[in-house]
């Protein structure tokens, strides 16, 4: 379906037509543009097994490990060559889950109210709305502190401070220690081990993924996923700025969109493994001259925040990685 047909369904809907017979040589897939096209379901049922769908496959053609949209939608990645899994360069994991944000998150005023010192407060971005630009700096964080936004997590392990102990007792009294996530921990008020990630990526979006360079080197809640670069493999390691320059482009967002989860009203969601398994351009194939040019444009964008530099970066990647439209791409395009 390409529009909301079932009001109670938040995700993309599909109707499966199954027959108890021996006709198992083909699987037919069709798309429905609107509610008016629901008549197709009746037509397929009445004419079964003669009428074919828009796309026909043998069961052996289908890979259960990939998203099925590959079999009925144009894949943006088909327009590009030399693709590799994002996991070649980075690992994506979710942000810190506290199990009780109201208890664990602190504003400066709340810290003062409960006499919690900085030693027991972990600097953290708690809400997506607090990150407005592609680069999040120490000055941005200080501005959030100044505006008394949620900027810390309660970090009490190994503390003997009386104010901390009092706040822990408050959590027990209010039942925080018995919540789903907290009660499963050895120490209920301990935080998940998530070192600050150099790059964050939005979980929900309507206009493509949003990547943020975490220059403040602080932690984040689940409003963002953490992107950690792989450095263990000499041949797979990549310069953080080069990767981030690519992630800022429409080319990157376009290819990533193949692996997202579609919700109602244009909302998309990406789980960590959706991103880990997604395709990216093989940046290791770029020559040193091109890399220098990319990094020069990246620095200019960082300084001036002018999107003209992003457009120029986009053109570089298109010129280096575009390929003649594949047979697969043309096949789907003709059915749109």
Language model segments and positions:
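Short secondary-structure transition/capping segments
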Residues: 11-21, 44-55, 228-232, 291, ...
């Amino acid at each position: 379906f390409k529009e909301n047909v079932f009001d109670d369904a938040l995700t993309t809907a599909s109707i499966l037509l199954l027959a108890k017979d021996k006709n198992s040589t083909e699987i037919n897939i069709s798309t429905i543009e609107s509610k008016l096209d629901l008549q197709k379901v009746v037509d397929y049922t009445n004419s079964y097994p003669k009428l074919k769908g828009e796309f026909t496959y043998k069961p052996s053609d289908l890979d259960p490990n990939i998203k099925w949209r590959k079999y009925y939608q144009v894949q943006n990645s088909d327009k590009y060559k030399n693709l590799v899994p994002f996991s070649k360069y980075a690992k994506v994991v979710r942000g810190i889950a506290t199990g009780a944000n109201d208890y664990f998150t602190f504003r400066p005023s709340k810290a003062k109210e409960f006499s919690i010192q900085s030693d027991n407060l972990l600097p953290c971005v708690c809400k997506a709305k607090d990150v407005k630009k592609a680069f999040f700096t120490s000055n941005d964080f200080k501005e959030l502190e100044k505006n008394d936004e949620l900027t810390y997590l309660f970090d009490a392990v190994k503390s003997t401070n009386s104010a901390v102990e009092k706040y822990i007792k408050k959590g027990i009294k209010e039942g925080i220690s018995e919540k789903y996530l907290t009660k499963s921990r050895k120490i209920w008020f301990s935080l998940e081990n998530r070192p600050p990630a150099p790059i964050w990526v939005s979980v929900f979006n309507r206009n493509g993924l949003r990547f943020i360079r975490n220059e403040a080197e602080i932690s984040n809640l689940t409003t963002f996923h953490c992107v950690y670069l792989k450095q263990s493999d000499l041949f797979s390691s990549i310069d953080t700025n080069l990767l981030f320059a690519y992630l800022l482009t429409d080319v990157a967002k376009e290819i990533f969109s193949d692996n997202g989860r579609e919700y109602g009203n244009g909302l998309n969601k990406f789980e960590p493994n959706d991103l880990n398994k997604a395709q990216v351009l093989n940046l290791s194939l770029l020559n040193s001259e091109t890399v220098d040019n990319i990094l020069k444009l990246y620095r200019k964008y960082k300084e001036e925040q002018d999107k003209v530099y992003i457009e120029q970066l986009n053109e570089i990647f298109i010129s280096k990685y575009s390929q003649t439209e594949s047979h697969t791409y043309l096949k789907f395009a003709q059915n749109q």
